Design a protein with these regions (language model features):
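Cysteine endopeptidase catalytic domains of the caspase/legumain-like
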Residues: 1-177
Length: 177
């Protein structure tokens, strides 16, 4: 994230999109690489990307807006307090890894959009290439002239309706203009 924030320093608009596993440990959110092998809770920080750090770095940039889109709570590997290790053993996690991600506040000039509410787990969409959230995001992004906030409002409505409000997207925004 350090390199990204340095490279994007002069950009007017910065967009980060992540689809994959996301977990919280002790109130901090982490995005897990696709090939990660985490055998114990204390390995999460060293083997993942710290979402809170990304938001802090983006918030420190003096100009431009930041849009962070996270489709990151599908099939949370640590929910249920037990995970299958690489050798087939069941590993227990002790209470610090609840399902879903912890709430975050978007830094000034930023919007953070989640595929589901804090603590929630997003549904898979096994019959399609993209998740349900990303499917609706792509559909509504194609609407010409639709302001960013309304794009995400439409995604919220579509996902909530299709899942019977089992999955409800969530945003935190401090965009000013």
């Amino acid at each position: 994230f350090r390199q990204f924030s340095l490279n994007a320093r002069s950009a007017r608009v910065r967009v980060v999109y992540y689809a994959g596993h996301g977990v919280q440990v002790k109130g901090r959110n982490y995005l897990l690489p696709v090939d990660t092998e985490i055998r114990a809770e204390d390995e999460v920080q060293a083997k993942s990307a710290d979402l809170n750090e990304l938001l802090e770095r983006l918030g420190a940039l003096p100009n431009g807006i930041n849009i962070v889109i996270l489709d990151a709570c599908r099939n949370n590997p640590f929910s249920g307090a037990e995970v299958l290790g690489p050798d087939g053993r069941r590993l227990k996690f002790r209470g610090a890894t609840p399902a879903g991600l912890a709430p975050v506040e978007a830094p000034l000039g930023s919007m953070v959009a989640f595929s589901t509410a804090p603590g929630g787990v997003a549904l898979d969409n096994p019959s399609e290439k993209n998740s349900l959230y990303t499917k609706h995001l792509l559909d509504h992004m194609r609407s010409p002239g639709l302001p960013l906030e309304l794009v995400f409002k439409q995604v919220w409505l579509s996902v909530s309706r299709e899942t019977g409000r089992v999955q409800v997207p969530w945003e935190s925004s401090s965009l000013t203009g």
